[in-house]
Amino acid sequence: MYKRQAADGKPTATNVWLWGMGQRPDLTAFADLHGVQGAMITAVDLLRGLAALVGWDRIEVPGATGYTDTDYAAKGRYAIEALDKYDLVCVHIEAPDESSHEGDLKKKIASLESIDMDIVAPILAHLEKTGEPYRLLVTPDHPTYLSTKTHTHGDVPFTICGSGIDADSYDQYHEANAAASELAMPNGWDLMPFFISKDSVSYTHLTLPTIYSV
């Protein structure tokens, strides 16, 4: 390629930047670990790779870009359709993270509103309409602050609703309410068993320390 570029009078590469090297981790299949069949909806290669490592199917959604112009409604529709086949569907949206990297408050607010209206609300309405037991979890995977425009470590809020979940006194989902919750999870890997457990849960706004920054 270098020789072709040079022969055509085009700019040539002068350095090779090797990034993200490492060995393929050996992870236990999600179904073997939890007895649940899962699928992933995402436009981000990292999440596609994680899905493959835990044995989740990857659902491709037309219009999913991994940016703020992603088709939120399409992700919501495809997730609803996938629930007929899978026990658990993970819908990943990169837009708020990208907005924080750009330091763009308006974009971040708009992306969160789109997630709420076009993904969370339709999925919740569908789950309630079925009349079958369900649970719905909303959470970020790590903090990305507008002020720093970069990933960081720290607690992240999550909220759960559905069968066996007793609502607490909070009616808004944000960091302050999560921090005031009586329940925290020092070990992030405890979240999934907590989420899919058949036992009742009496708190819906909790604090979960991030496991890693991506």
State where each predicted segment sits.
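Loop-centered beta-sheet repeat module
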Residues: 3-31
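Flexible, glycine/charged-enriched surface loops at secondary-structure junctions
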Residues: 4-15, 61, 89-90, 129-135
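Active-site proximal loops enriched in glycine and acidic residues that flank catalytic Cys/His/Asp
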Residues: 62-63, 92-95, 104, 116, ...
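Conserved small/polar residues in nucleotide/adenosyl-binding loops
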Residues: 1-2, 204-210
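Metal-dependent active-site segment of extracytoplasmic phospho-/sulfohydrolases and closely related
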Residues: 111-154
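Anion-binding catalytic surfaces of enzymes that hydrolyze or transfer phosphate/sulfate esters
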Residues: 23-109
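Internal helix-turn-beta structural module
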Residues: 139-196
